[in-house]
Regions:
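A short acidic, amphipathic alpha-helical/loop segment
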Residues: 1-5, 165, 288-292
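Conserved catalytic/switch belt of AAA+ P-loop NTPases
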Residues: 1-22
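Interdomain motor-coupling "hinge/lid" segment immediately C-terminal to the ATP-binding subdomain
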Residues: 19-20, 26-143
Length: 337
């Protein structure tokens, strides 16, 4: 690897090399031991998006506990979140939207990024069927929030082929696997079930473009959770959790005849496990959340992210938080600045 010689012969020079992680996923690249530091990169968070678009004060409010922020300000931030749902966090997309104010131009950049991914897929035809890889990529984007099965990801190919495509996309960090687990203790990964899983995409903007979400129609929705059947909201939460809190995501699911239950996410804060639901509001059904809190007494409280302002119920077991508050609900990752 030629870059090693910069480290050895010119260590004062700062070098950044960019490229597709698919090459790493296929094992095409060798890394010189002891000469590479790894830093996990993510799309820009909602906080970073607000900073980039000149809304510094609003950005700082998103990192504050919502009880310390006036309800009217929370509502303004939620309105701004609508734009982020469609612009997403890819830096070039954010820059285009900031400079032009045009969603159309932003969507064009998103399409170019997706085309570049597909061009990357075609380079690795001997390793994996390109059509299968692209079909699984699209299937995951359309299935955010749903439990997945390899056999259903792409009807035209075998479960084994679909799994290979899914695993390669996950290794390249274009998608992220979210297994179910038993929240009876830490670490959550100790009880992860690799056969029961959901998935999220790299970026919410790319996800909506890939799914061809009808933007004009969805922007008329007053409730963020109603946009694209709630899939945009769940993708947003997954994306923010990965950036702020953890390199792994988990959820809880119970399959019982006539009494199935599922809680969208599990987060860890100060050594305690908190179930997290992404719901339309206090009036929505929270049966699964109540069932989990009853079954797992070690969970001190349930958190509900919704399209409204902060609200804590009298029994103290449920707290309703504005959807943008994902950055405040779990332990912050050490490398988040």
């Amino acid at each position: 690897m030629a870059l090693r010689y910069f480290y050895e012969e010119m260590p004062e020079l700062h070098v950044i090399a960019a490229g597709s992680l698919l090459e790493f996923a296929f094992g095409e690249i060798s890394i010189p031991v002891g000469r590479v530091q790894y830093l996990q990169m993510h799309p820009m968070t909602f906080y970073e998006y607000l900073l980039a678009t000149g809304k510094e004060q609003m950005a700082e409010y998103t990192l504050s506990q919502p009880d310390d922020v006036a309800g009217s300000i929370q509502e303004i931030i939620l309105k701004e979140l609508r734009s982020y749902f469609f612009v997403g966090g890819m830096p070039e997309c954010v820059k285009t939207y900031r400079d032009s104010g045009s969603m159309v131009e932003t969507f064009q950049v998103q399409s170019e990024i997706l085309d570049s991914y597909r061009d990357d897929f075609s380079k690795y035809t001997p390793h994996i069927n390109t059509i299968c890889l692209d079909a699984v990529f699209l299937s995951v984007a359309k299935s955010i929030g749903e439990q997945l099965k390899y056999t259903r990801l792409n009807d035209g190919y075998s479960s084994q082929m679909n799994r290979k495509a899914f695993d390669l996309l996950a290794k390249a960090k274009v998608i992220h696997k979210i297994p179910a687990c038993d929240p009876s203790g830490l670490p959550l990964g100790a009880t992860a079930n690799p056969k029961k899983f959901k998935a999220s995409m790299l970026d919410i903007g790319l996800m909506q473009r890939l799914c061809q979400v009808p933007v004009d129609l969805e922007l008329q929705q007053e409730n963020l959770l109603a946009m694209y059947r709630g899939k945009l909201a769940e993708q947003f939460v997954a994306q923010e959790l990965l950036a702020w809190h953890s390199s792994e995501l988990f959820y809880w699911a119970r399959e019982s005849r006539g009494s199935s239950a599922e809680v969208d996410f599990l987060v860890v804060r100060q050594g305690k496990i908190y179930p997290v639901e992404v719901k339309s509001g206090p009036s929505g059904s929270l049966r699964s959340l109540h069932l989990m809190l009853e079954k797992y007494q070690i969970c001190p409280q349930g958190l509900v992210l919704y399209s409204g302002t902060s609200n804590k119920l009298s029994d103290q077991k449920l707290q309703f938080l504005p959807l943008y508050c994902v950055s405040t609900i779990g332990d912050q990752r050490p490398n988040v600045v």
